[in-house]
Structure formats: structure tokens, C-alpha cells
């Protein structure tokens, strides 16, 4: 990855509200399925904005065996996804997205960020990200003191 894209908490909330506005009216949804772990925070933000109380998770772990990504489903929400929003923070190469589509073929799959390789796999997203860019999410960063340039 050659570039970094830093996401602040404020930016994330703005993007989540924009996505939520596209998902109105909220009464059409039975609930939200958040993809753990990246979709947990965006899922909470969508649940708040849409007034949705039914929130479930699908937990997928990816392993790298000899440069081949293997996905393992640790926990899944029941059903085929009909009437549900499935949310993840990002669609990148599409590996996780393909698994999600297979598990929940009738769900409305959304992300906050989308890279070109994964874009065709989601129903909606907010921010285009170049394929070779690494996203730093706010939950993966800590706030640290940065001394003034002058050193005084």
C-alpha cells in the first residue's frame, strides 16, 4: 500500500449519516447485521440514525496460508438477509464480500468505503478509495500529544 487515508471519528459519523439518509425510510428494514469487526462501529452509527434496535453480527476471521486467504465463519446471523442491512466498514478485494453475499443473498449490503475491486459487490457505499490505499480507521488509532515544531 503506497498511500494512507486517515479517517477521523467526525468523518466516520458524517459518512455514516450520509449512508443512513440513503437507506430511508427506516421502516423497510427488519434490522442490521454488522460484519465483525470493521462493521461494528458503522453498524452502531446506522442503528442510531435509522432508529433500528435489532442489531446482529456475522463474525468472519481471515487467515493467510501461503498467500491464499482463507475465511472462517465464527458466528453468523440466521436467515438469508431478507429485510436486513449488512454493513462493513470497507470493501477491498471482495473476499469477505463474496462470502457475505453467499450467506445473505437477499440482504442490502453496504459499506462506508469502497475500493475498485470490491465495488461491484456492494449495493451502496459513500467514499471511493484507490485500490492501493491503506485506510486507518479511528478505532485503530490513539490520540497522542504532538510537540510543537519549534520545540518550545
Curated annotation (Swiss-Prot):
Effect of residue 59 to A: No effect on catalytic activity; increased stability
Binding annotation for xanthine: 92, 135
Chain positions recorded as GMP binding sites: 69, 92-96, 134-135
UniProt keyword list: Cell inner membrane, Cell membrane, Glycosyltransferase, Magnesium, Membrane, Metal-binding, Purine salvage, Transferase
Amino-acid positions noted as binding 5-phospho-alpha-D-ribose 1-diphosphate in the UniProt annotation, renumbered to this chain: 37-38, 69, 88-96
Family that this chain belongs to: Belongs to the purine/pyrimidine phosphoribosyltransferase family. XGPT subfamily.
Subunit and partners: Homotetramer.
Protein name: Xanthine-guanine phosphoribosyltransferase
Protein species of origin: Escherichia coli (strain K12)
Amino acid at each position: 500500500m503506497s498511500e494512507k487515508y486517515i479517517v477521523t471519528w467526525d468523518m466516520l459519523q458524517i459518512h455514516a449519516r450520509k449512508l443512513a439518509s440513503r437507506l430511508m425510510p427506516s421502516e423497510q428494514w427488519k434490522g442490521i447485521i454488522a460484519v465483525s469487526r470493521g462493521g461494528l462501529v458503522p453498524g452502531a452509527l446506522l442503528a442510531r440514525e435509522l432508529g433500528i434496535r435489532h442489531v446482529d453480527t456475522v463474525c468472519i476471521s481471515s487467515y493467510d496460508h501461503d498467500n491464499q486467504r482463507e475465511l472462517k465463519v465464527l458466528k453468523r446471523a440466521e436467515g438469508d438477509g431478507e429485510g436486513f442491512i449488512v454493513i462493513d466498514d470497507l470493501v477491498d478485494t471482495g473476499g469477505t464480500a463474496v462470502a457475505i453475499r453467499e450467506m445473505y443473498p437477499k440482504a442490502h449490503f453496504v459499506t462506508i468505503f469502497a475500493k475498485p475491486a470490491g465495488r461491484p459487490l456492494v449495493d451502496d457505499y459513500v467514499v471511493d478509495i484507490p485500490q492501493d490505499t491503506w485506510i486507518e480507521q479511528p478505532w485503530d488509532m490513539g490520540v497522542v500529544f504532538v510537540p510543537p515544531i519549534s520545540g518550545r
